[in-house]
Every structure is written in structure tokens, then in C-alpha cells.
Amino acid sequence: MQNQQIRIRLKAFDHRLIDQSTQEIVETAKRTGAQVRGPIPLPTRKERFTVLVSPHVNKDARDQYEIRTHKRVLDIVQPTDKTVDALMKLDLAAGVEVQISLG
């Protein structure tokens, strides 16, 4: 595992949840002796929806909704076996999607 690099991508709708999960991952990796690059905030995706409020006429009556998807990237350089084990056992928040890739 010495020449490997672990890239962790996090996605969430709530920025506080993603920051908390990122902090937990960074603390776990540093505690096990790995070097961490990041967290790097990626651009937030804003998805907007416009809904007609009126069931029949009145095109002027509309509501607009927005969903923001926050993203972060972490690189763990030169992870040890302890680092991988600790990351596998880590329990993160339910609203955070985690993608892990080795490279």
C-alpha cells in the first residue's frame, strides 16, 4: 500500500453534514499516520425546479425550489494498513454519499 493513493469523494445536500464527515475522515487518517491532502471543495451543483401552483389557469402563480449538492474531495497519500482498516470501520452520517477509489 506504500505507493498507493486513496481518493475519497463526498456528496451531500447539507453542507454541515459533509463538513463533519470530512473532518472525521481527516482525523482518522492522520491518527493512523497517513498524509492527507484536502478537503478540496468542488463546485456546488444547484438544481432549480419551477412548479405551477394553480391547478388550471394563472401562469403567474409559481413556486421555485432549489436543491444544492455539495461535494468534497480528499486524497490520502501513502496510506498504511491501519488507515484502510480505520476508514472501513468509520461510521459516517446517513446523508453523505461516499465514493472511494484507489489510484
UniProtKB/Swiss-Prot annotation:
Q: Name one GO cellular component term.
A: ribosome
Read off the SUPFAM superfamilies from this record. Answer: Ribosomal protein S10
Recorded superkingdom: Bacteria
Give the UniProt keywords, A-Z.
Ribonucleoprotein, Ribosomal protein
Indicate yes or no for the key word Ribosomal protein.
yes
One MF term in GO for this entry?
tRNA binding
GO BP, sorted A to Z: translation
Pfam families in the cross-refs: Ribosomal_S10 (PF00338)
Task: Give the InterPro entries listed for this entry.
Answer: Ribosomal_uS10, Ribosomal_uS10_CS, Ribosomal_uS10_dom, Ribosomal_uS10_dom_sf
Self-association state and partner proteins as the record states: Part of the 30S ribosomal subunit.
Q: What does this protein do?
A: Involved in the binding of tRNA to the ribosomes.
Q: Which NCBIfam families match?
A: PRK00596.1, rpsJ_bact
Protein family (similarity comment): Belongs to the universal ribosomal protein uS10 family.
Question: How is this protein named in the record?
Answer: Small ribosomal subunit protein uS10
Give the species this sequence originates from: Stutzerimonas stutzeri (strain A1501)
The lineage, from the top, is:
Bacteria, Pseudomonadati, Pseudomonadota, Gammaproteobacteria, Pseudomonadales
Q: Which gene encodes it?
A: rpsJ
